[in-house]
Regions:
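Generic structural signal for residues positioned in beta-strands
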Residues: 7, 73-75, 99-100, 134-135, ...
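Metzincin-family zinc-dependent endopeptidase catalytic domain
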Residues: 13-116, 124, 128
Length: 162
């Protein structure tokens, strides 16, 4: 069973106004028992790609999941991220473990950021990309991410509950 506790690590550069309302949103959507928000103390330089000027998102996810012994962990970072084979990613997730979300391309828009966090946490809870109008729709650009729904479709909602 996936933990019902969430620990959010926030890049200290990110304005608190960006994450106002995030805690209530995540409790409503995912029914977390507890959410703890704290500033990220250190981002490992080993995850930084100097040629690309981006963080490798899977490296960040491995790092934060090794630092948090129990529960789901979410890193919200201000820098750009990528994974092998893609120019950039809004985020990356691992089922039952946690997620990394970069706000670099999300225009400092709290609703846009919540949408991408909801998407990545959907993956943490086992959801795949969805082809219906849904927050789980794959986005390959800022435009596509902007256009997708802010909530789960009925199919994904049912899958989350099972």
């Amino acid at each position: 069973m996936i933990s019902s506790d969430l620990r959010i690590l926030v890049d200290p550069i990110i304005s608190p106004s960006i994450i106002i309302g995030l805690e209530n949103h995540l409790i409503d959507v995912f029914s977390f028992d507890s959410i703890e928000i704290s500033k990220l103390v250190q981002i490992p330089s080993s995850c930084w790609n100097t040629v690309r000027q981006q963080f490798e998102a899977n490296c960040l996810l491995a790092y934060i999941s090794s630092q948090i012994p129990a529960g789901i962990v979410l890193l919200i970072i201000s820098k750009d991220t990528y994974i092998q084979g893609l120019n950039f990613v809004f985020g990356v997730a691992s089922k039952g473990i946690g997620a990394v979300v970069s706000i670099y391309r999300l225009e400092n828009d709290p609703e846009f950021i919540q949408k991408e966090i909801t998407h990545e946490l959907g993956h943490v809870f086992g959801l795949k990309h969805c082809f219906l109008p849904c927050v789980m729709t794959f986005s390959n650009s800022v435009r596509e991410a902007r256009l997708k729904n802010t909530s789960f479709c009925e199919k994904c909602r049912k899958e989350m509950k099972s």
